[in-house]
Amino acid sequence: GQGNVNNVWNYATAVANLFPELEITMRNVEFNVELDDDGCMPFRARKCLGESRLDMIPACDGEFGSILRIYREWKYTGDDEFLKGIWDNMMKALEFSIKEWDTDGDGVLDGKMHVTYDIEFYGPNTMTNTIYLGAIKGVVEMAEHLGKQDIADKYRALYEKASVLVDEKLFNGEYYIQELEDVDAYRYQYGIGCLTDQLLGQFMAQAAGLGYVLPKEHVKKALQSIYKYNFKECMDDVPNVQRTYALNDEAGLVLCSWPKGGRPRFPFAYCDEVWTGVEYQVAVTMIKEGMIEEAFTIIKAIRDRYDGYKRCPWSETEAGHHYIRPMSSYSLIPTLAGYSCDMVNKTMSFAPVINEKDYTTFWINGKGWGTYHQTIDDKGEVKKEVTVLYGNIDDVKVE
């Protein structure tokens, strides 16, 4: 492919953090070059490479994800001109996407949704709905900033309604499921299975600074269930007829399991595979919920597999070498540091979740980069030192 598949880039956070201006060019290509007059976005960008536009159905997770990432890029850089220049086409894409995938107009996506597993999901599920919730939550804030209060009010009402409905429909007490009357009516579904990517939009929303899109207590319970059911200490007993990214006595987080039965006759083909890009995003979300031990166990399993002996530690393979999905790993750095930045409101803050008494980390945003050092003495006095190695953050409040 061209290396720009929008739903795979949902996971990757390294470029957005380290080179935000470069990431912005991707949003401009998606919305100002590739988008058609109806608001439909191809999931691969080809026109910018001098090729014909991709003639395939759009990706639900990718199109909503690109909208959410507009919010992220805006927050990382504080670039209002970028937001103004992309706004009209972003709204065109949003309106198309809601009409395309919320078929009954109740606020919950339920249509035929092409996703990153190279198949279509049917019916409500939280993999796509959390991304959608993050996108419309971000639109509310962007609209308010631009003085478009009618739009903000419209999508705030939709968000508040949809967030409640998604949770009520899909949370089974342990994790979020896919709602289908007959899981075998369509091939490649997961039904009442425990999908590792069920909180993908939550990961994306938190990486962008949007907070929760589903109830905090249900998010944590779902993460506990993902770890309980999908983390395998040994892959020996996991039948897998697809690609082998973990095997024998290696550990890993499979993409889906069916702890309550109900495995479809033809589940989505990759369900028994292990993808590092998914493992990292789950680990990051776990850290947000205080599940440090579980997160580190997953990360260690990845690094044990890519140990430089069995596999190259610099090329975590999926649909090829140096695949972009594992760039979700970058989010470990700001998440462990409890780092957040908002260059629109010119604030940045730190709240390390490990080694709090003596912690040093790297920080970066659209204004500059440097280091942060924190110490806590025996009396509980906290000392914080922010060093700027490039750029200027004189107008940024450090909290």
Predicted segments — roles?
Residues 25, 85, 214-216, 394-397:
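Short helix/loop capping segments that flank catalytic or ligand/cofactor-binding pockets
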Residues 88-92, 222-225, 300-304:
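Amphipathic alpha-helical scaffolding segments
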Residues 1-166, 207:
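Substrate-binding cleft of carbohydrate-active enzyme catalytic domains
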Residues 246-251, 268, 272-273, 279-399:
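Non-catalytic C-terminal accessory modules of carbohydrate-active enzymes
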Residues 1, 20-57, 99-124, 167-275, ...:
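Extended glycan-interaction surfaces of carbohydrate-active proteins
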Residues 145-193, 201, 206, 210, ...:
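Repeat-solenoid scaffold signature
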Residues 7-11, 16, 62, 125-131, ...:
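An alpha-helical repeat/solenoid feature that recognizes helix-turn-helix modules
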